[in-house]
């Protein structure tokens, strides 16, 4: 079945190559894609090849993506794609709550070394039924996972905003070229009531206090001046499409305005 599916995909790509001027973006987790690099090469700047690499940690990869190839196999595939002259991009997604700034930085630096046209980023957003499965897999491998972020929508919101802010910070410190990083915030994050509930939960957890009028005003101001503009920027359809390679280098960013800082 897998060989048949691959044959159908290859045939479709051959038709696109010969009978159209369409561009093609491929995203996969499978190193088997290397078998078609000869065809990808023929597309030139019309094709972008991408790998999904959320972490460099092999055991975390086994926990969250038990049926996917490990990160080292994916990195080798990217390396061979670049060596073959194929333009590449990376989905650093979904990143995991078990990794902090140091691990995220190492992943981003490793991926940036491939000179990808784009790096997409999105934090993991687990459905409730998957949490128990991941916890069980972690126990099987002798590890624990930070599943507390999935206990409520508010706890997940806090995790997601923290993760986005960390990735923005790292990209700035790496001097990543404008337009390379693409953040993919979930549309449900664009809710001021949800943001305020998250802030109230954080006040009780971190400060041991109620959500006072002063804290409520500070949170409302943060939403209006910082969080909402950031979300609106990344929810703009122009920003949800990556750059495209051209014969003289990377094309200009779709939107000439840089991403707002939070």
Residue ranges and their predicted role:
Residues 102-262:
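Auxiliary Fe-S-binding modules of radical SAM enzymes
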